[in-house]
Amino acid sequence: AAGNHDYGYSNISVRRSNYNTYFPVDKNFKTQKIIREAGLNAEGVPTMENAAFEFTSPQGRKFLLLTLEFAPRDTIVAWAKNVTNQARYKDHTGIILTHSYLNSANQHIEKENYPITDGNYGAAIWRKLVQPSSNIQLVFSGHIGKPDDAREHVGFRTDKNAAGKKVNQMVFNAQAMGGGWYGNGGDGWLRILEFLPDGKTVKVKTFSPFFALSPATQQFAWRTAPYDEFEFQMDK
């Protein structure tokens, strides 16, 4: 999902972006098989900043995945709500990817100090889009962090949507690991989710191929703190 540094000259001073220049809707032939809609960016162009994808897992579970721009505008929240409410997706598991949503205290972000005034942050996205839905069950975000503090880069919470289904919400970032904001760019940390065949259990692990590459650092390749290695349950 597009983040604050994808807009304007620095830190979303305006809504203009080169995102569509480098990631146009028709660039990746593999996504052409699963993309269903592209919402309009601030300049009125359908782009990957706001897009809907549909796919089926190897176990047969149907997913609807939506990417949303940084601090999505009301028009985009309405677009996303319209997509998720379509009858053809009523039995899908909805996933939202956005940027600013949860903080490290596992709370929905209320507001941020950026020049734009037309955005919705975590609390508003939850209130306007996620909670009223009957099929959104997963929300993933990034954005947060503190130099060389793994705990301040992550968060997780579970609530219920209007249909009473669990909504598991996760934030994961790594950009200030490995020397701070201008250091090693996150040391390659990845969040791995394994969806088990029972259709409800998801295992979460945190891994760095950067550390795994060398015998001298392989022992640091897996982070195993409770906030980095855990399981959660989804509703079927």
Predicted regions: what is each one?
Residues E69-F70, S100, T206-S208:
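A mature extracytoplasmic/lumenal domain signature
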Residues Y7-S13, T75-V77, S104-Y114, D148-R151, ...:
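Extracytoplasmic/secreted cell-surface and envelope-processing proteins
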